[in-house]
Amino acid sequence: TSMGTSNFIGGGGLMADPYTGLAYPQRIARAELTYKTGLPITPTLDWLTVNQADQITVPEDAWVDWDAAAQKFITVGEKFPDGLTANIKSVSVYPDDLFETVKWHDGSPISVADFVMSFIQGIDPAKPESPLYDASLALSIDAGLVSFKGYRIVSTDPLTIEAYNDTYNADAELNILPLWPLSPFGL
């Protein structure tokens, strides 16, 4: 779909192998997956680092929701003051030259704002306070937010994005959540 939960739990930073369906990096330089010990997750390919942890604590400053009325992100610390844990933590690290070499259709360079806006566009239509509210999308977006635990931009040089989620796939490669934008910020 072009809207709804697919916008904030996946994207074009990866591409699918046409025979196996496993993800390969398309726009990311490297990735790391940490999953909760005991989950049935197995890596097949060697392009990502895979670790286990007894507990994955979501940082308080991770963005977990969007306040359409105030036009601001809601952090984990604000929404879950007692803390939040996740089943998986995905880290996507983009190439050092991402902002110089990747261009949009009009020639403008991709920017951090494009990544941030992609997350907003994935959630905003579910918010009744939003001028973009769409009741037909709200249920699927809200369903995705139940297992979504947060995004956090930890660096812009190189761009490094952490994602936290409770939904997981048995194939480690399919748990990388790159937040790749589908359109430029200015659209």
Regions flagged by a language model, labelled:
Residues T1-G122, A126-L187:
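The feature preferentially marks the first beta-strand/turn patch immediately downstream
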